[in-house]
A protein has these predicted regions:
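Amphipathic cytosolic juxtamembrane alpha-helices at the membrane-cytosol interface
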Residues: 83-95, 135-139, 143, 193-197, ...
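Transmembrane alpha-helices
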Residues: 98-123, 212-245, 292
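Hydrophobic alpha-helical transmembrane segments of membrane transport/permease proteins
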Residues: 2-4, 38, 46-81, 248-257
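Periplasmic/extracellular loop-to-transmembrane helix junction in inner-membrane transport proteins
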Residues: 23-28, 56-114, 264-282
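Glycine-rich helix-loop "coupling/hinge" segments at transmembrane-helix boundaries
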Residues: 161-164, 176, 191-192, 233-234, ...
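Transmembrane alpha-helical segments of polytopic membrane transport and secretion proteins
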Residues: 1-38, 294-307
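Generic hydrophobic transmembrane alpha-helix motif, especially the helices
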Residues: 75, 79, 85, 107-110, ...
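C-terminal transmembrane helix and the adjacent membrane-cytosol boundary/short C-terminal tail
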Residues: 162, 169, 179, 225, ...
């Protein structure tokens, strides 16, 4: 079999800044993605500037204003302990979108949901690439284990993991990564099975490149489009899962302003005519997930047009 000199020498790669510029142009050209970006950007702004946009702290209590409706003093009302709901939403947005709290005195940038998705991407992409490129018994063994994990309902799997390792921000990250790994691995495997048949992969094999070089330098970058879109969707799913775990009492431990825990604490007062403590965090979760899904849908739609 003959391979052209250009194929053997490899494909000329587009400079990174041009790839970034093209991605930004795709994002900015989509009205759907821009609508989602505005929603997510609003909550990111609220999370970053939480200490400056409210005169209260998330744990400050006013026993004279328990379950108070929205007013000039408390724009979204208060919960059953007299804590300002807007303040708690703002500080909750910090955990959801800005920082990952390790303990009371230490935190790292980038949010709980994103760390979980990134960890799942690393593990899932590695397993998917190895399975697709190596094939045989390795592929069968890895995929059957992941299929067994996917047989569990997602929320049940989250509950099993958190119940086993305990509830904390770091453990929620691990749970998000574990639950997301099978789906990511199957996506990457399907993309890699298609890409590994391309001429430039055969050219790399003829050049004698290391299998890991082929997997992570030749195959993975050419699968990045669908992976990025899937990752954005998974961040939304992870935020929804964090809210569900908080509602079930398995989320971030108190006194964290966990949106799911806020819904759980306020639901008992809905029928008594005080829905505010449950209503606003529910809308916050819904709006954020919708915003992320709009970004992913817009990117997917515009990427298809550019192909």
């Amino acid at each position: 079999m003959t391979v052209s000199e250009q194929s053997v020498q490899g494909i000329v790669r587009t400079p990174r800044w041009q790839r970034v510029s093209k991605s930004l142009s795709i994002l900015l050209s989509s009205k759907i993605a821009m609508a989602g970006l505005i929603i997510v950007g609003f909550w990111v702004f609220v999370g970053i500037f939480a200490p400056y946009i409210s005169p209260y702290t998330p744990t400050e209590q006013d026993y004279r204003a328990q379950n108070a409706p929205p007013s000039a003093e408390h724009i979204l009302g208060t919960d059953d302990l007299g804590r300002d709901i807007w303040t708690r939403l703002a500080y909750g947005a910090r955990v959801v979108l800005v920082i990952l709290p390790i303990n009371e005195n230490f935190w790292i940038p980038i949010v709980t949901a994103i760390w979980g998705v990134l960890l799942g991407l690393v593990v899932g992409s590695t397993l998917g690439l190895i399975g697709a490129y190596m094939r045989g018994g390795i592929d069968e063994g890895v995929m059957r284990i992941l299929d067994a994990m996917m047989a569990f309902p997602v929320i049940l799997l989250y509950m099993i993991i958190i119940s086993a390792i305990g509830s904390s921000a770091v453990n929620v990250v691990l749970a998000i990564a574990i639950v997301g790994t099978p789906g990511i691995a199957r996506l990457v495997r399907s993309l890699a099975l298609d890409i590994r048949t391309r001429d430039y992969i055969r050219a790399a094999e003829i050049r004698g490149e290391n299998p890991f070089y082929i997997m992570f330098v030749e195959i993975l970058p050419n699968a990045r489009g669908p992976i990025i879109i899937d990752a954005l969707l998974r961040v939304g799913y992870a935020i929804f899962a964090m809210g569900t775990l908080g509602f079930l009492g398995l989320g971030l431990p108190p006194p964290s302003s966990d949106w799911g825990s806020m819904v759980a604490g306020g639901r008992r007062y809905i029928l008594s005519g005080d829905p505010w403590a449950a209503l606003w965090p529910s809308l916050a979760i819904a709006s954020l997930v919708i915003g992320l899904n709009l970004i992913a849908d817009g990117l997917s739609e515009e990427s298809t047009r550019y192909q």
